[in-house]
Amino acid sequence: MKKKFVSTLLVLSVMSTCLLSACGSKPASESVDLTSVSLDTIEEKAKEEGTISSVGMPDDWANGKGSWESISNTYGLAHDDTDMTSAEELSMFDSEKDSPTKDIGDVGQAFGPTAIDMDVVQPYKASTWDSIPDWAKDPDGKWTISYLGTMGALVNKNNVSETIDSWEALKNSSAKITLGDVLRGASSQMAVLSCAYAMGGDAENLDPAFDYFKELASEGRIDVGDGSVERLNRGEIDVLATWDYLTLQYRDIVAENNPDLNMECHIMQDGAVQSGYCLVINKYAPHPYSAALTVEYLLSDEGQIERAEGYARPIREDVTLPDDLKAKMISDDEYTNTIPLADNDTVTKACTEIASRWEE
């Protein structure tokens, strides 16, 4: 659910414009000013609330289960989640503002500014704020990226003899590439954008990527099926382009379900964009202190390490991962030429163009 991107983002862009110009009714209750409250008070009030209700933060995404269990065990907060796309999360925040049920969400990087435009989020700066890169947070604290994904490749070595660690290597192989739903999938669109950079283009020049995929298509080397675990387990996919943490999760799942398959994970060395997911607190959150405490925990050393246990790389570079965990992840050496996507507007335009041109 978290991978759908452009079609719903376009809807939200229109929606946010309408909301800003319309004279809407006042919400049932004003939001708390979390920026003026001490951490001790937030923890005390959160324990009194006793509940945290999230959207788009499921157990099986970036070790969400481990994080929620720790939050529950540490602070006594009961948790429930409704999984949905980033656009749906923000739409729910707005549609429920008079009778809110959700406290916090996790949205794709490009949706952070959209959330502000829609005026459905409230600020909070965790105590680790200064260790978070400036590009990865709203200056006022209305969204904060908590973990990163980098474009990688999951390679079925039973099907592919070559080492696929770059778009050039893929092009020169006989392997088929699985991209998933390029019309609506964030990871799929980021794969195309990564290829553009690798082939000499960028977010404002996508032609090299489309030339690349046209050539692969002419050779019958684009697999139009999805990148599901079921297909991976059956050995139907040669190379799946997706976020690094998903390649590692899928590798582990396939190893358990079909030990005869040998899966290899790499970062695309000639073009690998890097993006993240933003924590956002509902402006109308029924449990605002619990939401702030959740943000605080997820950006703490413990919370960042737990994200890494789901193979998502922490946003905070000052967090030291345990050696046994680092050994399971893709080597740091493969991340030397990654491309952070700091300009959200440019990325949004690029994704819109990718979806439009891919359909052609």
Per-range role (PLM):
Residues 41, 48-49, 312-360:
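An extracytoplasmic/periplasmic, membrane-proximal ligand-sensing/linker region
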Residues 1-49, 360:
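Short, low-complexity disordered leader/linker segments with a strong preference
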Residues 272-273, 277-338:
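Mature extracytoplasmic/periplasmic domains
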Residues 53-69, 80-94, 98-237:
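Extracytoplasmic ligand-binding site segments that recognize negatively charged/polar headgroups
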Residues 31-39, 47-66, 277:
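Extracytoplasmic "Venus flytrap"
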Residues 121-130, 141-145, 168, 256-273, ...:
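Short beta-strand->loop
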Residues 50, 75, 97, 174, ...:
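Sec/Tat-exported extracytoplasmic proteins
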